[in-house]
């Protein structure tokens, strides 16, 4: 919250690193901000159902909110998507007027007018690499090692699930060096 007060939403989201789904209500401006991490690790659902704004990290919380009102309608196109892709693509959910916020986006909601504005706050930059193979390997190693080291900072023991693939094996091998 101090970051929002000091820098505003755009600068705050530029500075935050990690997994998150956050909500900030600015009482003075009567604006609600909902934001999701860059990689989309933490989910964030939001809805505008009959003029009621709702949000939660799990869809079942929004279902529970409206269960006695019987106002949630199924979005049948989402079911078709599920049968086609075996998941419901973002931003859809199984309900009309309830959505999953995309990774690296935030939602600015003017509470007075119920106006929703979706803003992408981060873009993945793809840069051409002109390094030779050895330099490129070293850079990749250093970046992955730094990322793993940052995730190893915890106040409880850290465990791993191994799929047997290259990615999980690489992470565990690097973590064992920390």
Annotate the PLM regions.
Residues 1-178:
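Cysteine-centered catalytic environments shared across enzyme families
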């Amino acid at each position: 919250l101090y970051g929002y007060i000091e820098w505003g939403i755009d600068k705050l989201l530029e500075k935050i690193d990690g997994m998150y789904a956050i909500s900030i209500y600015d009482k003075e401006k009567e604006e609600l901000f909902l934001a999701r991490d860059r990689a989309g690790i933490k989910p964030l659902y939001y809805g505008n159902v009959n003029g009621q704004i709702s949000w939660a990290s799990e869809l079942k919380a929004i279902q529970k909110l409206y269960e006695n009102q019987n106002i949630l309608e199924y979005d049948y196109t989402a079911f078709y998507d599920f049968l086609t892709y075996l998941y419901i693509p973002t931003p859809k959910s199984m309900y009309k007027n309830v959505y999953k916020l995309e990774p690296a986006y935030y939602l600015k909601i003017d509470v007075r007018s119920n106006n929703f504005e979706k803003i992408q706050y981060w873009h993945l930059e793809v840069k051409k690499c002109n390094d030779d193979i050895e330099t490129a390997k070293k850079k990749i190693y250093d970046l992955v090692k730094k990322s793993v080291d940052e995730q190893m900072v915890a106040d409880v023991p850290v465990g791993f699930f191994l799929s047997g693939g290259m990615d999980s094996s690489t992470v565990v091998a690097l973590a064992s060096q920390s």
